[in-house]
C-alpha cells in the first residue's frame, strides 16, 4: 500500500485486499449483531468479549501487514552506478558463518542484492528478507512486516475458529427456527468462515513451519538450502523468538510526503582553518629546520606549480670561435687542475661528455706553417678514415674517399693537435718511405713513443674494436692492434697517440720510463722505416672494421663540420692543382732527414752508418723542409731510385697496383708530364694518425714544459736555430699561400 502513493492508481490490485477486508469486517460484524446477544445470555458475556479482542487483533495485524514498509532498499542513483552497471558481474559470493552465499546483481536497482533479498516484480523494489508478495494485503512481506503478517494469519485463524464455533452453537440451539433471521445470518457467517478457514489454516500452518525452520517463502519455493545447511537459522525457539520478539528493523527509504531536513556533520570533515602560519618541518640532507609557510591555497598551489614546471637548466651552448681563442691561450695545466672546469650540469646531462669545456685541442697560430700533401690520393683519406676510431669519431663517408688530406684540419673539438703534427712531420718522412726495407739483424730498435699510462688506460677498461662514441669510450679509449703495434714487426710498438679527451701530459708519463730501460736510440733511416712498417691495403681494410658513431652523442661542432666538408671539396681541388704543379717543379728528393741538432739524446749509433737500402721518393720530402746537415744534403743526391712495388704501398687499388709496379720513380722534372694519378704518393700518413704526438715532443727530459713554450722554439717543425738554414732547392719557398679554414684558423702553405 505505501508504494502506491505517488504512482499511477490501479484499481485491480486493490480487489483482493478489499474483498479480504470486507469479508473480515462484514462476517465479524454480522456475528456480533445476530449471534453474540444470545451467546451473552445463554453461554457467557465473555464470548462476545473474547471474539471482539481477537477481531481487533486480526484487524490490527492486517492493517500493519498492509500499510507497513516491508524493508525496501533504495535504488542506486545514476551517478552512483554508472561505473559499475556494465562492468559488474552477475553474481558475487560472500561467506556467512563459513558458508558461501551468492549475491545477484539487480539490473533494476543497480546494486548487489544482500543475502535473502529479492526483487519484487509487483512492487518493483528490492525487499530485505523477501518472503512473498501477498495480494490479500496488497503488499510485499519482508523483514519489517513479516511478523505482523504471521500474527495476522494466527489471529485470523483463531478468530475464524471462534466465529464458526459460536455460530454452530447458536444454530444447534435454534434448529426449529432455521427460517428465522438470526439463524439464517448465523448460517451465512458460518459458511463464509468455513469457506475461508481451510486456506487460511493451511497458509498459517505453512508459515509456522517456515518460522520454525528459519526460512522464507522465497527460499522454500526456490529450493535454497534444500540440500545444505541454512546459515540463517537460529534453531526452532530462536527463530520464533527472532520473528515475534526481535526489534523492528529500520526503514531505508523516507516517506515522500515527509521531507525532514537533517544537518549531518560527518566526522571526516575538518574545520576550516584560517590563514595562519603553520610550522612545516623540512628535511634537507639530514638538516632539519622549521619553516613558516602560509597555509593559503594559492601559496600551496604555487609551490606545486613551481615544482612541476621547474626544469633543469640546459648546458651552456658551445661557442666555436670563443673556444678556439681560449684553447690558443690555455695549456695542459688547466686539464690537470684539481678544480673542475666543467660547469655544474643537471642529472640528465652529467653522464654525457661535455665537449669543448676543457682545452684538449690546440690550433695553429698564424705564424706557424703547415705543409700539406694535396695530390688527391684516395689512400690519404683511407688512412684518415682509420684515424683512431676509438678515441674520436670516424666521420668520413665513402663518397669522400677522394678528398684531400687537409680535411682533418677542420675546426672541431675532435680535430688533431696541429702543433704535434708539424713537429713530427720530418720523422714521419723518414719512417714511412722505408717501411719495406729490411732492418739490420742485430740492431735493437728503440721507439720514442708516448704510450698511455697503465693507471690511465687499463686493459680491462678498454672498449672493443667496434665500440661507438659513448661516454666510456671517450674516457677510456683503447688502442687498435694496427695502431699500437707495427704489423710488419709485431714486437716494435709504433708511436703513441694523444687522445683528445685526456690532457697531453697524461700521455707523456711513460716517455722517460722507456728511456730508462732502453739504450741510446739509433736514428738510422733504415731503422725508422722498419719501425714504421706498412701493410697491404687489403689486409688493413680487412683488419679494420667500420666504427659506428652515435650521432646523438656528438657535439654541434662535429655535426657542423660534416656539413661543411662538401663546401671545402671544391676549394681543396683548386688547392690540389696548384700545390701539385709546384711540387712537380721541385728537383731534390730529401729522403734521409735526421733529427735536429738540439735533440737531447745522444749521437746516432754505428748502425746508422751502414749502407742504406734503396728508398722511395716521397712528395712530403719535396715541400717545406730544408736538409738538416750537409751530410744529409750530399747523400740526398746520391740515392738510388728503386721501383716501388704494389706490396709497399698502402693506397693502391686494383688498377693502381699494376701501374705502380711497373713505374719507376724519377725526378720530378721527368715526371712533370705525367697524369696526377701516376705521381708517387706519399705514405707519410699511412700508418700513423695525424693526431699522434711527435717523437720529438715526447722524447724530452722528464721536465715537461707547456705546449706554448715548445711551440715558441719551433717553426714548421724545426728548431729556431735551423729555421734559417739555406734551402737546397731555390724554388722551394718561391711563394706562400694562405688558406683560412673552419673557425678562423689560418694555414700557410709553402708551394
Swiss-Prot record:
Polar residues: bias regions: 633-651, 669-681, 724-733
Keyword Repeat among UniProt keywords: no
Topology feature Cytoplasmic, residues: 1-13, 63-148, 207-751
EC number(s) given by UniProt: 2.3.1.225
Annotated Gene Ontology cellular component terms: Golgi apparatus; Golgi membrane; mitochondrial membrane
Ranges for region Disordered: 293-346, 437-461, 633-659, 666-685, 703-736
Pfam families named in the record: DHHC
Extracellular-side segments: 35-41, 170-185
UniProt keyword annotation of RNA-binding present: no
Active site feature: 134
Residue stretches of biased makeup (Low complexity): 326-338
Keyword field: Acyltransferase, Golgi apparatus, Lipoprotein, Membrane, Mitochondrion, Palmitate, Transferase, Transmembrane, Transmembrane helix
Segments passing through the bilayer: 14-34, 42-62, 149-169, 186-206
GO molecular function: palmitoyltransferase activity; protein-cysteine S-palmitoyltransferase activity
Record field: catalytic activity: L-cysteinyl-[protein] + hexadecanoyl-CoA = S-hexadecanoyl-L-cysteinyl-[protein] + CoA
Compartments (UniProt record): Golgi apparatus membrane; Mitochondrion membrane
Domain DHHC: 104-154
Protein family: Belongs to the DHHC palmitoyltransferase family. ERF2/ZDHHC9 subfamily.
Entry remark concerning the domains of this protein: The DHHC domain is required for palmitoyltransferase activity.
PANTHER family per record: ANKYRIN REPEAT AND LEM DOMAIN-CONTAINING PROTEIN 2, PALMITOYLTRANSFERASE ZDHHC8
Function (record text): Palmitoyltransferase that catalyzes the addition of palmitate onto various protein substrates and therefore function in several unrelated biological processes.
Protein name: Palmitoyltransferase ZDHHC8B
Organism in which the protein naturally occurs: Danio rerio
